[in-house]
Amino acid sequence: MMIVIGYDAGNTANVLRALAQVGVAARLSADPQEILAADGLILPGVGAFPAAMQELEKRGLISVIQQAVADGKPLLGICLGMQLLLESGLENGQNSGLGLIPGVCRRIPDQAGLPVPHMGWNDLQLQQSSALTAGLDGQSVYFVHSYYTDVPEEYLDVTADYGRPIPAMIHRGSVFGCQFHPEKSGAVGLGILEKFKEYVYENTARY
């Protein structure tokens, strides 16, 4: 069973619908025992970094997610959920993240002719391969965000060009992140969720 972590900061209905389209048995949960028992986890997210971390803390989920990852559970963060994977974020001051991938979440710099938030379809540029990146180079996906993940190159898999390279996908071990919304990115996005399902299956041999 795949668990979509529920903490009132994510577009969970669309994520669950997309997972169902690729044959994933998934449900929404904030129950620590269900999260720790899951085969794989998805952390969606929309909104502000500090508010989202507060919602996770209020539910006692920060240490639960960290423990699940330490136990080897695959985790996919989507949009704000990807940003929360980092050590810290600079939205409305400096705030601690989940600390699962080294890096800092920063605001996209203002650039002439490029409004913030970065909103709409953008092409992907492969930097290095991961379990989720096959066939993605040059594909177009849907972004909505004002902040980006500043991570060391070793964790950067895919970028998009928005006046500068913007991290689109990152990963460390069994922790993956998509800055864009795979659930809103048509067949390309569904393909990423399908690859995550396959990765979870290979990781657990029982999904």
UniProtKB/Swiss-Prot annotation:
Originating species: Streptococcus gordonii (strain Challis / ATCC 35105 / BCRC 15272 / CH1 / DL1 / V288)
Molecular functions per Gene Ontology: glutaminase activity; imidazoleglycerol-phosphate synthase activity; lyase activity
InterPro entries recorded: Class_I_gatase-like (IPR029062), GATASE (IPR017926), Imidazole-glycPsynth_HisH (IPR010139)
Protein name: Imidazole glycerol phosphate synthase subunit HisH
Residues annotated as catalytic: 79, 181, 183
Subcellular location: Cytoplasm
Protein's job: IGPS catalyzes the conversion of PRFAR and glutamine to IGP, AICAR and glutamate. The HisH subunit catalyzes the hydrolysis of glutamine to glutamate and ammonia as part of the synthesis of IGP and AICAR. The resulting ammonia molecule is channeled to the active site of HisF.
Alphabetical UniProt keywords: Amino-acid biosynthesis, Cytoplasm, Glutamine amidotransferase, Histidine biosynthesis, Hydrolase, Lyase
Pathway: Amino-acid biosynthesis; L-histidine biosynthesis; L-histidine from 5-phospho-alpha-D-ribose 1-diphosphate: step 5/9
One GO location term (cellular component): cytoplasm
Signal peptide (UniProt feature, chain positions): none
Quaternary structure (record): Heterodimer of HisH and HisF.
PANTHER family in UniProt: IMIDAZOLE GLYCEROL PHOSPHATE SYNTHASE SUBUNIT HISH
Residues covered by the Glutamine amidotransferase type-1 domain: 1-206
Entry EC no(s): 4.3.2.10, 3.5.1.2
